[in-house]
UniProtKB/Swiss-Prot annotation:
This is Probable transcriptional regulatory protein EF_0663. InterPro entries: Integrase-like_N, TACO1_YebC-like_2nd/3rd_dom, TACO1_YebC_N, Transcrip_reg_TACO1-like, Transcrip_reg_TACO1-like_dom3, YebC-like. It holds the Pfam family TACO1_YebC_N. It comes from Enterococcus faecalis (strain ATCC 700802 / V583). The lineage of its organism: Bacteria, Bacillati, Bacillota, Bacilli, Lactobacillales. Its main location: cytoplasm.
């Protein structure tokens, strides 16, 4: 994992994400709703809801929006239902692409995802075609500007709690964990007084592909098109610096 900075990729696409902030809030609200519906409205007792709330806060979603989504899930009646679906395929230059969606209409979402791939230099694959190229990881970010950090002290906290790897840059520390150790590492860092800029479960590519400028521009269009879909919650690629 050394040399892979998810944070730098996130910052590189920040302007595009800022332009979609309203849509991001809508998608995260859906995740909060489903998590609260399945496991109850208390994030302290519902790990999936805690993850969704943390994701919302990382996106600067207002607390009122978060509370509204939880309250909606707690209301009487069946309410809404969404299926979790994963689509796999290849983008320009043979880059692997994973698409996670929450949908109330699988046919609609599958059609939209397929069109996005075919119109932007990609191809939708079969289940299992690229998933094996990614590892599920816990991912935590601590900004240097938020702390006077003694790196050895932080490293000790991370390793004792079960962290796997730390990537450092002038701006942030990026901490990776096995999925089963994510909660322990996150809680240990918070108890040690660290403010977490981001804390989530994510998919990390095992190998990064370098694209030329044309391929990168085409992949950016593909990712943008996928992220524009209301049902798509996350898009992961094996491209370097996207």
């Amino acid at each position: 994992m050394s040399g892979h900075s998810k944070w730098s990729n996130i910052q590189g696409r920040k302007n595009a994400q800022d332009a979609k902030r309203g849509k991001i809030f809508q998608k995260v609200s859906r995740e909060i709703y489903m998590a609260a519906k399945a496991g109850g409205p208390d994030p302290a007792m519902n790990p999936a809801l805690r993850l969704a709330v943390d994701k919302a806060k990382s996106a600067n979603m207002p607390n009122d929006n978060i509370a509204r989504a939880i309250k909606k899930a707690s209301s009487a009646g069946e309410g809404e239902h969404y299926d979790e679906v994963t689509y796999e395929g290849y983008g320009p230059g043979g880059v692997a692409v994973l698409v996670h969606a929450l949908t109330d209409n699988r046919n609609r979402t599958a059609t939209n995802v397929r069109v996005a791939f075919t119109r932007n230099g990609g191809s939708l694959g079969e289940t299992g075609s690229v998933n094996y190229m990614f590892d599920r990881k816990g991912y935590i970010v601590i900004k240097r500007e938020d702390h006077a950090i003694e790196e050895d002290d932080m490293l000790e906290v991370v390793l004792e709690a079960g962290g796997e790897d730390i990537e450092t840059s002038p701006e942030v520390f990026e901490i990776y964990t096995a999925p089963e150790d994510f909660t322990a590492v996150r809680d240990a860092l918070e108890q040690a007084g660290y403010s977490l800029a981001q804390a989530e479960l994510t998919m990390v590519p095992q190998t990064l592909l370098t694209l030329n400028d044309e391929q990168k521009a085409q992949l950016e269009r593909l990712v943008d098109k996928l992220e524009d879909d209301d049902d798509v919650s996350e898009v992961f690629t094996s491209a370097e610096n996207l």
